[in-house]
Structure formats: structure tokens, C-alpha cells
């Protein structure tokens, strides 16, 4: 009888240990997903502008890589006044880290006669994106 009690306690311990490991793996997966950055490849057609963040309400950071062979102009502007807050000309194959305030939109201006491809990685989901003709 004494030996059967020990073996049943052993199995209960093993089951609890497995549940603890599953909980740990689940928590690590949630942590990884919550820290995951939003990344996408975007093509901006010739002589068009991509406006990003018109409906956004929080600050964010953007990692931008120009994967094309032509430059692109990136401008930050205040939503309310249209006043430019920052302007960068990103050369072909260039990289940029951009900090964007909640009251700003970013314009990716393609004034070339060819499409521009960029890789864009954001620290959060950003609402409000559209294209306009230059």
C-alpha cells in the first residue's frame, strides 16, 4: 500500500509539472507575439504619394528600407496644420529609423517615373493609409 501511494504521488507531480511547462510555453508565445513588429513590403507607384497614419492616435517608430534603385522623399507633417516637421530623402538601398508622434502623418513621396519599393517595419499597427497622385 505504501508503494502505491508513492507511485500515485509521482504521477500527480509529473502531470502538474507538464501543466506548468505548458503554461510557461503559452506565456512565452504571448510575449513573443506582443513584441512582434508589424512588417510589410510596400510598392509606391510612379508619381504617387503614400500617406500613413491619418487615423493613428499613438506614437510609433518606423524602420524603413528603400529596396529600389531610385530615391524616395519622406515627409512628416502635423495633422491639424499641415506644417512639415521632418523631411528626409532616402537614397536607393538606404535605411532609416523614424520616430513619429501621434499628431503626425508620414508622406512617402515618389516623384520618380518608376515605382519605388520599401520595406516598412512598425512598432504597432497604424490606422489610416492611402495613396494620392502627386
Briefly describe each language-model feature range.
Residues 24-33:
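Sec-dependent N-terminal signal peptides
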Residues 41-49, 53-55, 91-93, 103:
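Tight coil/turn sites that cap or link beta-strands
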Residues 69-85:
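Short, surface-exposed beta-strand/strand-loop-strand elements in extracellular ectodomains
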Residues 112-134:
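C-terminal partner/receptor-binding element of secreted or periplasmic proteins
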Residues 13-25:
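Bacterial N-terminal signal peptides that target proteins for export
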Residues 82-103:
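Intrinsically disordered, low-complexity Pro/Gly/Ser/Thr-rich segments with frequent PxxP/GP/PP motifs
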Residues 64-68, 108-112, 120:
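Asparagine-centered strand-capping/turn motif at beta-strand->loop junctions
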Residues 98-114:
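Noncatalytic modules at the cell exterior or secretory-pathway interfaces
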